[in-house]
Amino acid sequence: IAYGCPDATREQVIEAAKRAHAHKFIVQLPGGYDTVIGEDGGTFSQGQKQLLCIARAMLTDPAILLLDEATSSIDTRTELQVQAAFDELMAGRTSFVVAHRLSTIRNADCILVMRDGQIIERGTHDELLAADGFYADLYRSQFAQ
């Protein structure tokens, strides 16, 4: 978590992990917060890797946040936990999120819908659903039961 922020205190690292919803699984590791993680992420699930990355971003506290397909390879149950962490991370900062899973951007102040490299729609989630255009079609296709 402290990678890229070597002067962070242990308390700051733990606080970032708690805010990212990663603390619970970290303390269950044999090495806890002293666990060394290899390049491939070891035996962590995709969701756990995401939460660790979110904790790292929270610790560095960037003014602008760029997220690219942040929930693309996790299951829906884990996505809820990761989304809660993202909501915490994005609060009070400018965030650009590239997403195909529309649940990731549902709470955005402004959504730009792109197709073939062009912006074709713009608005909040509710505005785009009400417009009944491309975004609404995508949303219905993702959440059809």
Per-region residue spans from a language model:
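Catalytic-loop signature of eukaryotic-like protein kinases
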Residues: I1
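C-terminal boundary and immediately downstream tail of ABC-type ATPase nucleotide-binding domains
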Residues: A130-Q145
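ABC-family ATPase nucleotide-binding domain "signature/switch" substructure
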Residues: G4-D7, I14-A22, G32-A131
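Conserved phosphate-donor
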Residues: F25
